[in-house]
Each structure stands twice: as structure tokens, then as C-alpha cells.
């Protein structure tokens, strides 16, 4: 079988490494420890897999924290910080990252119109940024198994609110497949297989499941 010619990666209606940016927002100890919509360990592992995936495909990352400079919050958890390798994340005081000038400038500077969103909590930091980005004409893709809320109901409400406004929810595995698209693109196959295999083995070894 012969693959079709590669579509224009900048104009493709699907997510590509060339037309997307990844927003990692508020993955800090307080936010993670107060998630109640799914198992916190599983959530963090999914976020790690998501970050590893976008880094493997060279997707630009905009990394932001809240209230670290003020001393009220701790920085991004090391499991993610060491993957992002960003020594100077954009620290805000705003709950809505889209109301922070430097954050919005950084997103615009990527030149990408498809935004992959991984933020805590779903009902606040994810939802507010998604709604504002959608209003400005961006396409927004919340990674549903790598975001979490203060309750299952809050998570669902935040996600539903953004979907009704036009957000397109994805899982981290579907994101990986969309970035890869063709097994004949051999350069990134080893990373994809390693990330997915590592994730599966970790889940099997701990047998942690999220609530339905």
C-alpha cells in the first residue's frame, strides 16, 4: 500500500507539529493535590506522557505557573519541569492565563492557531483560557485525560462549557497518533512507541484506574 503525499502541515485541518502549540498551565503541587476528578497519580502520568509526546515532535511549549513569584505557590512539579526544560516559566497572578499579557504574547509568538491545552483545574485555568482563545479564533484541544478538576462534576462542567464554545477534546494517545499519522514517517516512530509502551507498562504495574 502507498501512503498519500504528505499534506501541507501548516494548512492541515488535523493537528501537526507545524501548526500547533502546547500550553502547560499550573501543574503545581497545590493544584494536583486538590484534583478529585480522577486518580492524581494517573493524571500526572498522563501529563508526563503528553509532554513527552509534544517534545518528541517538536511542538512549541508555552509553560506558565501562578503565584510562584509571590511565594504563595510552589513551582511546576519536577516530573514535568525537567521535561519542559524551561528555567523561566511565565508566572502570573491571574487565574485566567489569557488575562496575562506575557502569556498571550508568548502564545501569539508561536504563530500557531491550534492550541493543545493541559491545565489545572479544568473548570478554571483550562476553561477560562480555552474560552478566550476560542473567542480570538484559535482552535483549542483540551487533553481530557491530562486535565482535572476539584470534583468530577466540576471537571465535566468545565469541559462541557468549552466544548459548547467550540473546543475539541482529545486524549493524549489520540494526540500522539495525530502528530505521527503515518508509520512510514520513521524518524519519530521510536519515540512514539517508547512513550506509549512506557505508559502502558506503568499503568499495568500499578493498576490505577480513573472513575468512570
Predicted features by range, described:
Residues 2-93, 109, 139, 151, ...:
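Active-site acidic carboxylates
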Residues 68-70, 95-98, 122-124, 147-149:
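Short, catalytically relevant binding-site loops at active-site mouths
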Residues 72-79, 103-104, 129-131:
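Distinct, well-ordered alpha-helical segments
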Residues 92-105:
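Short phosphate-binding loop-to-helix
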Residues 95-97, 109, 133:
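Long, charged low-complexity segments
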Residues 107-113:
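Glycine-rich phosphate-binding loop signature in dinucleotide/nucleotide-binding domains
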Residues 114-166:
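A contiguous pocket-lining binding segment that forms or flanks enzyme active sites
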Residues 144-146, 171-174:
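Short secondary-structure boundary segments
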Amino acid at each position: 500500500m502507498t501512503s498519500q503525499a504528505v499534506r501541507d502541515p501548516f494548512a492541515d485541518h488535523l493537528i501537526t507539529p507545524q501548526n500547533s502549540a502546547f500550553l502547560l498551565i499550573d501543574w503545581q503541587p497545590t493544584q494536583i493535590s486538590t484534583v478529585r476528578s480522577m486518580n492524581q497519580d494517573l493524571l500526572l502520568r498522563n501529563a508526563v506522557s503528553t509532554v513527552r509526546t509534544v517534545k518528541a515532535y517538536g511542538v512549541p511549549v508555552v509553560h506558565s505557573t501562578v503565584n510562584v513569584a509571590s511565594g504563595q505557590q510552589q513551582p511546576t512539579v519536577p516530573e514535568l519541569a525537567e521535561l519542559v526544560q524551561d528555567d523561566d516559566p511565565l508566572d502570573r497572578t491571574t487565574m485566567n492565563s489569557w488575562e496575562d499579557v506575557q502569556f498571550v504574547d508568548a502564545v501569539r509568538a508561536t504563530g500557531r492557531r491550534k492550541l493543545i491545552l493541559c491545565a489545572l483545574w479544568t473548570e478554571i485555568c483550562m476553561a477560562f483560557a480555552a474560552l478566550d482563545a476560542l473567542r480570538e479564533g484559535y482552535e483549542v484541544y483540551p487533553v481530557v485525560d491530562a486535565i482535572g478538576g476539584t470534583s468530577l462534576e466540576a471537571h465535566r462542567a468545565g469541559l462541557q462549557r468549552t466544548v459548547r464554545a467550540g473546543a475539541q477534546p482529545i486524549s493524549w494517545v489520540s494526540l500522539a497518533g495525530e502528530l505521527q499519522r503515518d508509520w512510514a514517517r520513521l524518524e519519530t516512530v521510536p519515540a512514539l512507541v517508547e512513550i506509549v509502551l512506557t505508559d502502558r507498562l506503568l499503568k499495568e504495574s500499578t493498576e490505577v484506574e480513573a472513575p468512570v
